Swiss-Prot record:
CDD domains: ATP-synt_V_A-type_beta_C, ATP-synt_V_A-type_beta_N, V_A-ATPase_B. Keywords: ATP synthesis, Hydrogen ion transport, Ion transport, Transport. Transmembrane segments: none annotated. Produces ATP from ADP in the presence of a proton gradient across the membrane. The V-type beta chain is a regulatory subunit. It comes from Clostridium botulinum (strain Hall / ATCC 3502 / NCTC 13319 / Type A). SUPFAM superfamilies: C-terminal domain of alpha and beta subunits of F1 ATP synthase, P-loop containing nucleoside triphosphate hydrolases. This is V-type ATP synthase beta chain. PANTHER family: V-TYPE PROTON ATPASE SUBUNIT B.
Amino acid sequence: MLKEYRTVKEVVGPLMLVDQVDGVSFDELVEIELHNGEKRRGKVLEINKDKAMVQLFEGSAGINLKGAKVKFLGKPLELGVSEDMLGRVFDGLGNPKDGGPKIIPDKKLDINGIPINPVARNYPDEFIQTGVSAIDGLNTLVRGQKLPVFSGSGLPHAELAAQIARQAKVLNSDSKFAVVFAAIGTTFEEAQYFIDDFTKTGAIDRAVLFINLANDPAIERIATPRMALTAAEYLAFEKGMHVLVIMTDITNYCEALREVSAARKEVPGRRGYPGYLYTDLSTLYERAGRILGKEGSITQIPILTMPEDDKTHPIPDLTGYITEGQIILSRELYKKGIMPPIDVLPSLSRLKDKGIGKGKTREDHADTMNQLFSAYAQGKQAKELSVILGESALSDTDKLYAKFADAFEEEYVSQGFTTNRTIEETLNLGWKLLTILPKSELKRIRDEYLEKYLNKAEESK
């Protein structure tokens, strides 16, 4: 039988201190009954002798120290999971938000999950087509990878997230594909945009949405990505689905961690974030991957906004250490009207070479990717030189590279948020752009591919 305590000693912000407790465990779920019969939930953050620090999910407003009853439920926060979750919208704590019935769960799972044994991991090597050329062609996403998007305030990362969620699929696979989408600390307008976009395009049928609004309690923001990843693990490893998890905005998650850390009077780390920020983020990102002998997989695209567009800020900095690359959105390209404004040169997918080539995308993928990177970099240098010295200082070849850079941004990178390009279309477009340059400049492509694909591209111009 569960004990009931009436020994609430102190309430500060989202934290409650309960005295004279016995047999309480870390991370245990707590039920608080107010003097008016209202029930709220929390979890145990810290235990010191007979005192327990409880973090409240719904906030502390209206709690009377003398009238509150506290029960420790002897289990962690859990999510009831079922295949019926597909097509549904939930709040940040896993409660239905779409007016539909409650889910009848197949089982209840601890939202903290169980780490995947490194020995049991299967290496990511299957191409995922997002329909976005700057990702598919140059910074390829691979099944089981974690590839974050580094954005800035006001940049269209929400539109890019919705586009990837709509369009993503694993090529040459009969397995079911699902999307788990977690909106963390989002505004009402942005949340409605995601729900409307998923519903209008039919993507909702294969998706599970967890929406945590900006005015929801901070502790719910900490639980939301874990709810999403728990649902993803169930669909991937028990139902054999390929699951793409998109989480936006990780910056809001880290702000919630900082808020709770400050309330606990912990010693702050860099820029006031807790010293365990790296460890905490790794508990989210490391839940991506594939397991030997299991059909399903979890691929992650966490999206974060860099404060003041600063790549050295602790959140993007630590995220970069844990994940396998980054897709960077550029404010300069955004101002030019390039959509999506993906800056391909500083962007990187560390596993891109594992998911491309014959039998996966196309035999010429690696060579054309290297040549496009090289040509675009030289084109940008030529344009910078022309700004300093004038266009007359450029050689004929430099002028062609500058022309290539403009065409590359306008035709290859820029495709809008509704165009879904196949990998064939992306590769063919790359060849078409390379015809701007003399054949003698295409030194990174093997002769056999030049003969096979360059002539076709020139004929189709």
